[in-house]
């Protein structure tokens, strides 16, 4: 039996993005899904980054090279799921994934993107799908006045 998202811990969220939704650019991602993936990558990459820095400071080229190679492999491996979850996070606030390119505007773009990533998503269905926090949402069809479950 698969866990409900309400029971997920950091590792469950990270695995959801890294493996089950590796290149899924459609739909919506909750803040928890995005930020736990970012935190998981940070925890995974930091030891190798430190290894590279220690290697340089001790003039140990082999150690530095090893740290840099592993760091690069991990960073490249998680580039696509990182981009995909960022696009889905933007979808959660009803913005197109193309808004991710705002990060190319020095300083201001990164700040705006960071604010958007911290913003709570739309509470109901938007242009990109149902609210990932409330999958039991009920939608009202004004043309046929009856309540239908999604």
Feature-to-residue mapping (PLM):
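Membrane-interface extramembranous regions at the lipid-water interface
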Residues: 1-40, 82-98, 116-150
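Hydrophobic alpha-helical transmembrane segments in multi-pass membrane proteins
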Residues: 32-89, 93-118
């Amino acid at each position: 039996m698969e866990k409900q998202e309400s029971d997920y811990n950091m590792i469950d969220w990270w695995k959801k993005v890294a493996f089950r939704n590796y290149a899924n650019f459609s739909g919506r991602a909750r803040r928890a899904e995005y930020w736990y993936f970012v935190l998981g990558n940070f925890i995974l990459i930091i030891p190798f980054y430190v290894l590279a820095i220690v290697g340089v400071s001790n003039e140990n080229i082999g150690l530095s090279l090893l740290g840099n190679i592993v760091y690069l492999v991990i960073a490249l491996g998680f580039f696509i799921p990182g981009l995909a979850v960022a696009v889905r996070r933007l979808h959660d606030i009803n913005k197109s994934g193309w808004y991710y390119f705002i990060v190319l505007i020095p300083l201001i773009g990164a700040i705006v993107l960071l604010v958007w990533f911290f913003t709570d998503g739309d509470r109901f269905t938007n242009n990109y799908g149902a609210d990932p926090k409330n999958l039991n949402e009920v939608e009202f069809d004004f043309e046929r006045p009856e309540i239908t479950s999604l």
